[in-house]
Amino acid sequence: MISDEAERAAVQQDFEARRDTLTQGNLFQVFEQPMSDEQKEAMTFLYAYMPLADIADHPGEFYLENVDYAFKAREEMPWGKVVPEREFRHFVLPIRVNNENLDDSRKVFYEELKDRVKNLSLYDAVLEVNHWCHEKVIYTPSDARTSSPLASVKTAYGRCGEESTFTVAALRSVGIPARQVYTPRWAHTDDNHAWVEAWVDGKWYFLGACEPEPVLNLGWFNAPASRGMLMHTKVFGRYNGPEEVMYRTPRYTEINVIDNYAPVSYTHLRAHETRSNL
């Protein structure tokens, strides 16, 4: 799963530092179970970078089952072998998308979607998953905490952040790299929005979550996105993709993806502080 030795060593170092810090409660007991090298690498990555609450809230077996289903999708879906390990590691393997409660959606969605998409191209599979998402969830505004993917299916509605969380979970369940993209403020109105990007054959495409269109890179927000000042997403781990890195923390990398929506150029500014003699 991590063929680069330096990257593998960095993940292992981050994992060990965290394990050495969190010594109470047998939080890492799952690593005492027999695992394949692939399983152990995936679990090490998840535990190195997932939020602390996720480690404490769910047993290790929950994450191990999700890891197994991620590998199952990679093995059984026709595009599994063409997804690079970097995109698989950062955009398929993680369970969390936003601040939703975690659930068993990966397994449930995979079993429901696999026969629907297995004979499609990767491009068409993304479109078909979004059609399926539209069948399950419609847009309704709300202010509550982001619902989990299965909760959104149960209620059959969600705001844009919930629809995009749900759609990312559905795409990842069948081994398609996906991420939630967020703009905190449009240029034309004092409002925000969240949607989805999916990786197809070396390129990231955008789509309106639960808003199916005949092609990718088409949505009601094409025009406002082309004038937006910030489109960003958070990626678990030390992500070293081609996108502009805005911020790094020990747990995630925040990237700016605005160049997927409009031509961009860079201006370098230097601030000088002038001290007054007053």
What are the residue ranges of the model-derived segments?
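Short, ordered, surface-exposed loop/turn motifs in non-cytosolic proteins
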Residues: S276-L278
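Conserved small/polar residues in nucleotide/adenosyl-binding loops
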Residues: T267-T274
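Beta-strand-rich domain onsets/edges
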Residues: V245-Y266
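Secondary-structure boundary elements
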Residues: I2-T155, D190-D191, E243
